[in-house]
């Protein structure tokens, strides 16, 4: 039996990670970006970079996404790593399954920016969505790892 396409993708991610020498936080961030860029994304997914009260973010939507349904997603990465880009493929699946648009926030990261900056960025993004006319009743806030902590 031949390896699956999914296994081939995981093996490629390991190969990319293993080939890199990492010395700094920036090196680790770049490595994570490269690893996650190996994951394939469906061709019908749309992404749009936006500024959210000065914080970069990315809208991710599928053809099924309804304009008034929104997920504010806060990525994981120990407050050191991660971005809309590293989570894009997973969030594309989330947008399709939920029929919602996903706003992935690139909150400020440590160690350059101390805590509570990620909390401030997250609250600011929530308020920005309300100002854009998104009803709190049609919004979900979620995240993984550090982003899950921010969502709470």
Show which residues each predicted segment covers.
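A glycine/proline-hinged amphipathic helix-loop "lid/cap" segment
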Residues: 1-65
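A generic structural signal for alpha->beta connector loops
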Residues: 44, 54, 99, 136-138
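Short strand-loop-helix active-site module centered on a catalytic nucleophile
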Residues: 57, 72, 94, 115-152
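Conserved catalytic-core motifs of eukaryotic protein kinase domains, centered on the activation segment
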Residues: 83-85, 114-115
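Short amphipathic alpha-helix adjacent to the substrate-entry channel of hydrolases
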Residues: 85-105
């Amino acid at each position: 039996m031949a390896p699956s396409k999914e296994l081939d993708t995981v093996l490629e991610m390991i190969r990319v990670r293993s080939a890199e020498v990492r010395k700094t936080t920036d090196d680790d961030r770049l490595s994570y970006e490269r690893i996650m860029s190996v994951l394939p994304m469906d061709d019908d997914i749309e992404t749009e970079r936006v500024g959210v009260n000065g914080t970069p973010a990315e809208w991710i939507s599928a053809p099924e996404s309804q304009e008034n349904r929104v997920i504010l997603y806060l990525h994981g990465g120990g407050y050191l790593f991660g971005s809309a880009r590293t989570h894009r493929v997973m969030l594309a699946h989330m947008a399709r399954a939920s029929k919602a648009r996903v706003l992935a926030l690139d909150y400020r990261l440590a160690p350059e920016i101390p805590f509570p900056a990620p909390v401030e960025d997250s609250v600011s993004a929530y308020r920005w969505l309300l100002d854009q006319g998104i009803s709190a009743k049609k919004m979900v806030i979620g995240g993984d790892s550090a982003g899950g902590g921010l969502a709470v």
